[in-house]
């Protein structure tokens, strides 16, 4: 009976998130998984807009670092107009602690028939290519993961300008969660990953000095 209740509630949550208008709704790609978890645990059932904030603290603790991005999904804060700040303009980046450069190079050499897109460009372009993109650094040494803005004037490791170094990145064709993005990039030996908030995943190779390309290029996950 309990499993049936959970299944029905999860379906209702997904239908609710799908029904919300695209221009005035929560960031479904970023929030759906965590919002479902918190709602299933009945931690976000109160309505602050109606004067009832009895669950606000518990809901905030459940959403943790995603509170700012996802509080509107559970009716805890005012909805945002995402047509002004599309999910593709934000991303989360993280350095992977056990990269396997030889594996990454082997998987990205030549043409592949796998569900990803390999892109290479000069490291100089990587360092100079600053778009209107807000990046968040996923920190793993905190009790709870926290997202902090990555400064635009990062100090990068020096590289020789007399030889053109290339940065190679991989974009998966389909949308995926940030957890799946990290696992997928680790499994192919990547050094870092960038997860755009529209759910596009980019794995970053060992020759890249910064966090790869700041442009969304996932074939089936562009918006």
From Swiss-Prot:
Its main location: secreted. Glycans are attached at residues 52, 81. It holds the Pfam family Tsg_N. Residues 1-25 form the signal peptide. The keyword Glycoprotein applies. GO terms for cellular component: extracellular space. It is found in: Secreted. The N-terminal domain is sufficient to interact with BMP4. PANTHER family: TWISTED GASTRULATION PROTEIN HOMOLOG 1, TWISTED GASTRULATION PROTEIN HOMOLOG 1-A-RELATED. This is Twisted gastrulation protein homolog 1. It comes from Pongo abelii (Sumatran orangutan). The lineage of its organism: Eukaryota, Metazoa, Chordata, Craniata, Vertebrata.
